[in-house]
C-alpha cells in the first residue's frame, strides 16, 4: 500500500463555528513524506500537523505557533484518517476550519471531488505495541494492540435524550462514510448562550449542530442515528488520533473521552518507542488494515 494524496486542488467555503464568518478551505496535493501541512494564507503561517503543534484542546483541537492558530480541525481530520491520506496541504483564510454541517460528510465529499492519488512511497502507519491509557476520574481513553483499527466509545449524560450510549466501530473507509461521517456535533442551548455572550460559537446554528434544551432536541428534523451522539464521539476520536500524522493500528476505547484526553493519549503513545512501531503496511503481520481502505 502506497502513501496517498489528492489528484487535484479543490476548495469550499463554509462558516466558522466561533467567529461566524465565511472561511475558505482549499486542499492541495503534496509529495510523498511531506505529511499533513496546514497553512493560513491570511497571515502566511504554516503548521505541520503533529502533537507538538497542538496548543489547546478545551473545546476543540487547536494547532498553532507564535504567529497564530487554526481551530476545530478534528472533523476534517477524521475524513483524512478515513481516506488514508498521508500528504496534504490544507489552506484556510482564517483562524478556524469551516464547520459545514457539524459532521465530516462535507469533507468526505470534498475529498471525493479531489480524487485520491497513490504516490511512489510505502504508506507508514503507527502500530500500537503495548497498552497506553490516560484517565481523569471515571473518564478514560486507551489504545491497545490490535490487528485492525477499532473504536469503542461510551458516553453518559444526565439528559433524557442522550443518557447512556455507545458505538463500536470496526474501521473501514466505506463503514466510516455509512456509519460515522454524518454524525453531527452537539451542544446545549444554555452553554451556547453563554459562549455567544463571550463572542464564541457565533456561527453555531441548528444547521451545523444538534441543539438540546433541558428536555429535548431542538432540531426539527431529529437525529440521523439513534446513537448519533456516541457516533460523533468516535468521529472526534478518529480526527484526534490523526494528529499523530499517521493512521493508527490499534483498538481505541473510551468512556466520556474528550479532545484533551485524546491529545494526552497520542502524546503518551509517542513518548516511548516501546509503545509503538512506525511500519509500512507491507511490514505488518496482518493484511486486515490494508483491506479496510479498499
Q: What is the meaning of each model-derived region?
A:
Residues 1-86, 91-294:
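C-terminal regulatory domains involved in ligand/effector binding and gene-expression control
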Amino acid at each position: 500500500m502506497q502513501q496517498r494524496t489528492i489528484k487535484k486542488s479543490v476548495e469550499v467555503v463554509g462558516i466558522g463555528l466561533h467567529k461566524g464568518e465565511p472561511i475558505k478551505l482549499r486542499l492541495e496535493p503534496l509529495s510523498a513524506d511531506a505529511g499533513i501541512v496546514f497553512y493560513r494564507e491570511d497571515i502566511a503561517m504554516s503548521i505541520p500537523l503533529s502533537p507538538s503543534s497542538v496548543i489547546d484542546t478545551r473545546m476543540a483541537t487547536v494547532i498553532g505557533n507564535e504567529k497564530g492558530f487554526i481551530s476545530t480541525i478534528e472533523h476534517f481530520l477524521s475524513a483524512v484518517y478515513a481516506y488514508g491520506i498521508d500528504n496534504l496541504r490544507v489552506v484556510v483564510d482564517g483562524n478556524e476550519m469551516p464547520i459545514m454541517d457539524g459532521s465530516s460528510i462535507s469533507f468526505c465529499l470534498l475529498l471525493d471531488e479531489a480524487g485520491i492519488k497513490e504516490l511512489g512511497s510505502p504508506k507508514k502507519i503507527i502500530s500500537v505495541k503495548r497498552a497506553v491509557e490516560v484517565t481523569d476520574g471515571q473518564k478514560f481513553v486507551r489504545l491497545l494492540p490490535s490487528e485492525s483499527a477499532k473504536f469503542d466509545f461510551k458516553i453518559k449524560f444526565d439528559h433524557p435524550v442522550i443518557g447512556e450510549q455507545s458505538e463500536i466501530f470496526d474501521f473501514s473507509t466505506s463503514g466510516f462514510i455509512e456509519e460515522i461521517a454524518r454524525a453531527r456535533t452537539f451542544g446545549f442551548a444554555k452553554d451556547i448562550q453563554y459562549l455567544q455572550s463571550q463572542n464564541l460559537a457565533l456561527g453555531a446554528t441548528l444547521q451545523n449542530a444538534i441543539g438540546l434544551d433541558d428536555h429535548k432536541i431542538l432540531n426539527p428534523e431529529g437525529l440521523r442515528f439513534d446513537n448519533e451522539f456516541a457516533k460523533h464521539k468516535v468521529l472526534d476520536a478518529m480526527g484526534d488520533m490523526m494528529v499523530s500524522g499517521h493512521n493508527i493500528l490499534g483498538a481505541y476505547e473510551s468512556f466520556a473521552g474528550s479532545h484533551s484526553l485524546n491529545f494526552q493519549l497520542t502524546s503518551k503513545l509517542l513518548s516511548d518507542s516501546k509503545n509503538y512501531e512506525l511500519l509500512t503496511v507491507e511490514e505488518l503481520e496482518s493484511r486486515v488494515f490494508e483491506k479496510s481502505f479498499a
